[in-house]
Amino acid sequence: MQPQTQLRHLNRQVQRKLTQCLQLASGYFNRTFSMPTVHYNVRGMKAGVAYLQQNEIRLNPILLLENSAAFIQQVVPHELAHLIVYQVFGRVKPHGEEWQSVMQDVFHLTPEVCHQFDVSSVTKQRYPYQCQCQTHYLSVRRHHNIQSGKAIYFCKKCKVELILQ
C-alpha cells in the first residue's frame, strides 16, 4: 500500500480513536468537547504536539506509519488529554496531575510522557569529527559550515580544531 493511501486509512483510525476518547471524556466530565483539528506535519523525533488554544493536534506521519497500532493507542490519547485538560482546568503543568488523571481515570491508560518508538528513520544525519580526545558528531548545518569555510569548531575539552574523519 502506498504511504499516502496508508496515511488516509490511518487518519480514519485516528479519528475513530479521538471520537472514542472524546466520548469517555464527555461522560466523565459531563460536558461536550469538540473534535480537534488534526494535521500530520510534525517532523523529527516528536510523535505529536497539542496546540491548546487552537484545539489542534499535530502528529508525526512517519512515526505513525511505522508504529501505527501503538501510536494510535498511546500518542493520540496523550495529545487529546492535553486539550481536554486545558478546556477543563485551564493552564496547568503539561504532564501534571490533571493530565495524568485524564490519562488514567478517563482514558484508562498509563500516563507515559515520552514515546518509546524507534526514531532511527527520523533522526538527522550526523557527521563524525575528531579532536585529540574524542569523536564529535556534528549536524548537517555545522558540517556544511565547515566545508564551505564559514566556520571552524573546536573541542571544548582539549581546545583542538575538529577535523572530519
Curated annotation (Swiss-Prot):
Where does the record locate the signal sequence feature?
none
Superkingdom, natural source: Bacteria
Q: Which UniProt keywords apply?
A: Cytoplasm, Metal-binding, Zinc
Q: How is the cofactor bound?
A: Binds 1 zinc ion.
Q: What residues make up the catalytic site?
A: E79
HAMAP family per the UniProt record, alphabetical:
SprT
Stated family: Belongs to the SprT family.
Protein name per UniProt: Protein SprT
| Gene that encodes the chain | sprT
